[in-house]
């Protein structure tokens, strides 16, 4: 604030008045309409009214409300008395702003504009929140994928992985993260990560039986556009809206080295391949027909590839591989047998082991399901012994009175039955060691570790309603085929036609279907307590 003494030496004039006599002034800021009315004379008798309620200006018997705010730059006002003297008028420390009064139409317009601005602001806020949520979901999905592939996310701190809290060098986020999948669309399955293309997976599916486009899309997890572009090249659509493999494409089918195939699947593929080559009128010495006769060589090679060290043998959880077409099958029986020979564990037979003892034994004996959900390992003797009552063991959609007994074919096939399948765990269960043979200590560290591993796998295993409905549909479609095979085999024995060359093939297929349907039934039964099918 400027005082008298501050400018007495700067001005060549005499100053009149003192600080005590000069009143406090108030600066009034008037709107343009009010000022024009005052200058034109339409507004007269202007006075200022100050009260406890507030400050207002009276003009022509009308009151105008004002807002009092402190002056941002307080100053003094002087009046020139004559050419040689100035008189202090007062000090300005407050400013009055006259409120502008609007009519009802203008007020409504301003109100609507304010509401629109608020609405636009809220919409922008919602869009921003949604975008942030999408980026968070994408980040979480990438971290989950890296964790699944055994990689640690780049932004993981040292304290979260059990290290010291010292500062660590974090790689730059701009560096590209290598993806393990060689496929253009990473579906998360192991065959896709190994680089098996979509064409091969579609061919392997259609080689078993014609399938619909929706089924292929569900199994391969491929986009609809890629699937629609590929199908006309390898298949044709029949009158049932199903895609059927073209005859020339059967030469690209991998019959014996395709791990997800079961025994029934391979038999079906071989039959369809033979018919396709016959329709193409290929000569008997054609190179394509060599794919049908190299069975023993490829099976031996496949078993050698599946053999794993005994210390790596782990119990496998009951995974429905009918959702994943190309999931690798269980280790072969030879690996478990080698473990038996090394550790002198007695073999299990049909007399001391049965898959019907407990639900846990079902889960232990069941391996990864193949394309139709069947076990890719050999069928156990316990499965074949239950063939005399297949209709009661498996839920039947129709009557079972026409089905005869298979006890006599089972007795004749006992000498050439397939090798026994053991539970996937290398230790025999308590139910299998009933005759006082070797049994591991229940409190041993290895057994506790095995039990903890199995419990963890069971907690991690979850089934969706869509997957279980697909399996139930497959069960209903496959059961009539099993029933017809059962009747055919029974008719051979009823007619004493056991020397028929087709009998062995039909019996192998019947045993495979029996094990396959039983595995499906156990899967559906386990999931029925969690899902409403």
Swiss-Prot record:
Region (Disordered): 112-193, 303-460
Major subcellular site: nucleus
Coiled coil: 104-132
Comp. bias regions, Basic and acidic residues: 112-126
Residue ranges with Low complexity bias: 163-176, 327-338, 417-434
Keyword Kinase included in the entry's annotation: no
Further information: Deletion of ell1 renders cells sensitive to the drug 6-azauracil.
Family according to the record: Belongs to the ELL/occludin family.
Protein name: RNA polymerase II elongation factor ell1
Lineage of the organism: Eukaryota, Fungi, Dikarya, Ascomycota, Taphrinomycotina
Gene label: ell1
